[in-house]
Swiss-Prot record:
GO terms under biological process: regulation of pH
Function: Na(+)/H(+) antiporter that extrudes sodium in exchange for external protons.
Protein's name according to its UniProt entry: Na(+)/H(+) antiporter NhaA 1
Taxonomic superkingdom: Bacteria
Family: Belongs to the NhaA Na(+)/H(+) (TC 2.A.33) antiporter family.
Classification via InterPro entries: Na/H_antiporter_dom_sf (IPR023171), NhaA (IPR004670)
Localization in the cell: Cell inner membrane
Bilayer-spanning residue ranges: 38-58, 79-99, 117-137, 145-165, 175-195, 198-218, 240-260, 311-331, 347-367, 390-410, 422-442
Annotated organism of origin: Myxococcus xanthus (strain DK1622)
Name of the gene this protein is made from: nhaA1
Catalyzed reaction equations: Na(+)(in) + 2 H(+)(out) = Na(+)(out) + 2 H(+)(in)
Annotated Pfam families: Na_H_antiport_1 (PF06965)
Keyword terms: Antiport, Cell inner membrane, Cell membrane, Ion transport, Membrane, Sodium, Sodium transport, Transmembrane, Transmembrane helix, Transport
Amino acid sequence: MAQTPPTSEARPRPPVPTLFRVALAPIQAFFRLEAASGILLALCAVAAMVWANSPWAATYSAVFDARMTVGLAGVHAGFTIREFINDGLMTLFFFVVGMEIKRELSSGELRTFSRAVLPLIAAMGGMIVPAALYAAFNQGTPAQAGWAIPMATDIAFSIGCLTLVKTRVSHGLVVFLTALAIFDDIGGILVIALFYGSGLHVSWLVGALGVLAVLACLNHFQVRNGVAYALAGAALWYTMHHGGIHATLSGVVLGLFMPARPLRPGRHVLEELRLYVDRALQTAMDEATRGAQILYLEERLEELEPPLNRFVHLWHVPVAYGIVPLFALANSGISLEGMGWADLLRPLPLGIIAGLFVGKQVGIFLFTWGSLKLGVADRPGGATLPQLHGVAVVAGIGFTVALFVAGLAFPTQPELLTEAKLGILVGSLLSAVVGYALLRFVAKPAVPA
């Protein structure tokens, strides 16, 4: 039943100074851009490269390799700032990925097989061919452990690239690339879980299963308290870390367990609120009480929003504009001292460049074209073949997850890790520039539906 709203006098909000609003306007306009997160990510990557090759290069390593120690109940753990970002904060990135995957599968573009089949097939091509190309260059060498690096598509960069040519691509193509990147994320998560662990420890994994049971109960009973999920997520991170599975994947699991249904059926809530509003309009009240009633209605309307959507909205901005750019800043700084163009022709960077720039576009385009020819699916948004080819090239921008996998593949081999980062940066840059050029100058403008 509806509760009586508070009748305390509402406090007026202090006016915002005009000068302050004017100063904030460009910042607010930037963050409203669809490509804003991709632009910020690129700026951080460039800043890291400039920093690592400047007279202050030593401070780059000093900052991100600085050690810190935390303790709780007599238990202490030490790690570097970079490890804290990569293994700690990036858990929140994977948490958002997990929630977005669940949202798309439950109520989004991937909720039916007919909608999901084409991006799924395209993603398979975009993972198989790049991995095979990399393996062809590095089979039998110490670098073969990095075979999964060119499998990833960076959704922020790739969608940001499409927004720069939005008059040339239909909304259906943007949805297609987004769904493809989501399946790429799923594939990358499975690869990390299966191939980049550190040796399984059954006792800790049993503990992780216990935490999963708790999460299942929280989901079943539609618990909306964020603290409960945070505590369960922390316990899952700890048990997976000691169990030999990369701990950041706990974020994906936690995201998949977030309730995707509203607490109560929407019709019931709206009926109650309609009756409440009718009674309120028939009663004379002052403006302060009216304001309190409106706040009460807002609180009741929150019951219509599933916890999954609420947490996606809560964490999207800090992850997209804080954690991921910080990850790029901490992991993109490559010293080019003593390097030449010949270094790009080494098997490791060449394998990554070939995988991202050649393997991605060949795999995605051929698998997509084959599916269309066989009648398995329809063209997304009535796209032309040149448009599909351009999107396939853009999907070769494999930045965030590719850097993450590189760190897992070469944790104790800094020279190989540097070569991998160089290959990722060059391959992603080639894919972005060529993909943009194809969509801007070759593909015909999108035809409005």
